[in-house]
């Protein structure tokens, strides 16, 4: 919002006085608005509304769009006569709230995965780790489960389990998705990471998971999910896009040694944290 909040509230009051409708009611009534624009305007209106403080709190986690829509109608005092005969206001409000609820549900699922630690005694975890190896190095067989050969994939020690402490099983899931669904890109990046100006593929991938998590509430990240769907698959797709973009960015800097890695990584983080078209930003 480009103007001070108090000026915005004065503006809303004057418009409400002349139209007899609240801001959200006007947004929902405007049939010329695109769905994403309506969603963004309603989200902003809720954020800056003194009356909807509890609604804002409810919308910080997964919620029932229909229930929240009814509460907004009651709190904001929508014109009940118009509401009774108008078939677009309430449906438009509910449809704008649905993507927000789905996004919060996705965040909950992601956080749940992040909190699951890698367990060497969990057969599913061990099988997933083997799947990662096979996806990236299908023609290479390791000498043992605990081996320095894991360093080829960019893990720090003989047991990759220790590298997943911060991101849990989510970090492994992201690496597997990228390595299986974008195998050509993943193998090319692995090759790049083992070149003269190398960086650890797996550790970098886990850092990319942390980066996407840290930025997920940025407006342009949220818009990505609102457009494409708030699913784990789309989270994995975004992760893959960020990883590919990072490698291109890193290679374009032509680093002379691995000592430049952290500086380049910070530059990249600054770049994608900007409020802009995320997909276009990553493809440039």
Swiss-Prot record:
GO terms assigned for molecular function: GTPase activator activity
Alphabetical list of PANTHER family matching this protein: ENGULFMENT AND CELL MOTILITY, LD01482P
Residue ranges of domain ELMO in the record: 124-276
Protein name, UniProt field: ELMO domain-containing protein B
